[in-house]
Swiss-Prot record:
It is found in: Secreted. The record marks 48-49, 86-87 as: Reactive bond. This is Serine protease inhibitor I/II. It comes from Schistocerca gregaria. Keywords: Cleavage on pair of basic residues, Disulfide bond, Protease inhibitor, Repeat, Secreted, Serine protease inhibitor, Signal.
């Protein structure tokens, strides 16, 4: 059980996504709230943190819920703001 938990924790901490863009080994960059490092083979490997969404204008009926990708949002009392879950949605 401890081994399974340790493996899950390690997996969550070290989940990497390789971008299609080529790079120079050793380079680093930020992508939203994630950090990317260029691997020795010249491809980007980035963490996959669930970044807070960028603020944007919304128009919704106060108190209602709606989906934003895989996240659920609740419309604020002003009808112009919403609070959403921060799941890391799988890319399609």
């Amino acid at each position: 059980m401890k081994l399974a938990l340790a493996l899950c924790a390690a997996f969550l901490l070290v989940v990497l996504v390789q971008a299609e863009q080529e790079c120079t080994p050793g380079q680093t960059k930020k992508q939203d709230c994630n950090t990317c490092n260029c691997t020795p083979t010249g491809v980007w490997a980035c963490t996959r943190k669930g970044c807070p969404p960028h603020k944007r204008e919304v128009t919704c009926e106060p108190g209602t819920t709606f989906k934003d990708k895989c996240n659920t949002c609740r419309c604020g009392s002003d009808g112009k703001s919403a609070a959403c879950t921060l799941k890391a949605c799988p890319q399609k």
